[in-house]
Amino acid sequence: MFNEEEYKSVTFVVRGTSMNPFLVSGRDKVILAPPRTPKIGDVVLAEFKERVYALHRVIDFKNGTYTMRGDGNPLSMTEQFTEEKIVGIAEAFIRKGKRVDITSPKWRLYSSTWKALRPFRRILLAIYRRIIVKILP
């Protein structure tokens, strides 16, 4: 869709709840770098159906097909895409007005912790959605 000659990076506001609790719709922003071959754990913007896009984390790669899932989505909710469908790869996020690079220790800690909490995510997300979202606007 885009290539390096067309842009260096692009920033947009996150919409939707699939990357909750760490990226909040309407508040946080993502800074995308041009497409490249993604690694497991990268957050990518990809077209997974015709004209349907998602900003999710790459969780698997098999036989030329990538699988991605939103951090706030159930474990069974995934999307598949091929490399040519990648629009961009996150290089940073702006959370609560502060830039967080994906190479920063803070982001790496978040990513590894969230991966380790996989068996407990459903409970943690339920608590987040039912309690924290109602308390904090």
Question: Which residue stretches match the model-derived regions?
Answer:
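Extended hydrophobic leader/signal-anchor segments used for secretion and membrane insertion
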Residues: M1-P137
